[in-house]
Amino acid sequence: MSIEHTVLVVAQDDDPQLSMLQGLRHVVGRTPEAFAGAADGPVVILAWSGPKKLLREVFLMCKDVRWVHSRSAGLDNVLFPELVSSHVPLTNGSGVFSQSLGEFSLAAILYFAKDFRRMIRNQVAGVWEQFDVEEIDGQTVGIVGYGDIGRAVAKRVRPMGMTVLAVKRHPPQTADPLIDQFYPPEDLLKMLARCDYVVASLPLTPETHHMISDAQFAAMKPTAVVINVGRGPVIDEAAMVRALTARRIKGAGLDVFELEPLPPGDPMYRLENVLLSPHCADHTAEWLNQAMRFFLEQDRRFSNGEPLENVVDKSLGY
């Protein structure tokens, strides 16, 4: 027997993908008042877009929330105390966007290895200048946070002949064909000292906030490149700018930032050794369609009493 419920879609944007819900009983709203008519019955909340404050207000006004789903993989804009302490399961879109972020990470590695900035600058200036570039075959990449995004990175760099290291809270007991060596978080500095490229793909939690700061940059090679495709505040940007300006590291490829949008005048716009993406490395032509299709499959599973995928540990934040 199907589990009856109404899907409450918290959405600030009029994305065309919302029309894919037309086969379900649902309400789309930008204010708590929009959901008042459904708040007394069993509901599923889809956090599609919008501020945490709105999601919290909708959650608190509903009497029978069965499940909450976050469109994105990151949960820092979804978690609030009442949801964390409740028995309501929370799922996310982890895995939906990983492939594109893995591709961006590889592109950033090649950008610095082949010095594409120099090529483009010379082309624009009409300068013919030959110079040496690097091979990434035989170099080492360290992945800080080996979840879906981290695995997507490993899948792309491993065939390029790179040695792949990874930090994971609970390293697997069996061998992983993509990883040469796992490190526990307490050995992060040891791993960083070995890396030519460091890819941060961590969720944002109290434990991961500024996990990469002055001490971590000091442990890196002066030729190291840092890439962030997880959450901006995982990296202490002030410490990173100091390291980049002093050339204590070679460069940084960034898709996420502590403050978004990045304010005009921020030094990262001007640094020659920074590759900057305005948090759109996963914005492919299909990304929102994929996100909605994943939710629809989740809703089918929920309706049929099947286990949900991507159930997160709310106390850990991922």
Predicted regions located by residue number:
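N-terminal glycine-/charge-rich "phosphate-binding" loop or analogous flexible N-terminal tail
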Residues: 1-52, 303
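Short loop/helix-cap segments at secondary-structure boundaries that form the rim of catalytic
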Residues: 16-23, 35-40, 58-59, 78-85, ...
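A short, aliphatic-rich alpha-helical micro-motif
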Residues: 35-40, 59-62, 136, 190-193, ...
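Phosphate/diphosphate ligand-binding glycine-rich loop within oxidoreductases
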Residues: 43-120
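Short, conserved loop/helix-junction motifs that constitute active-site signature segments
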Residues: 57-64, 81-85, 217-222, 243-248, ...
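Phosphate-binding beta-alpha-beta segment of Rossmann-like dinucleotide-binding domains, i.e.
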Residues: 88, 93-140, 148, 152, ...
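Rossmann-like dinucleotide-binding domain for NAD(H)/NADP(H)
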Residues: 90, 223, 229-318
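Rossmann-like adenosine-cofactor binding region
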Residues: 171-267
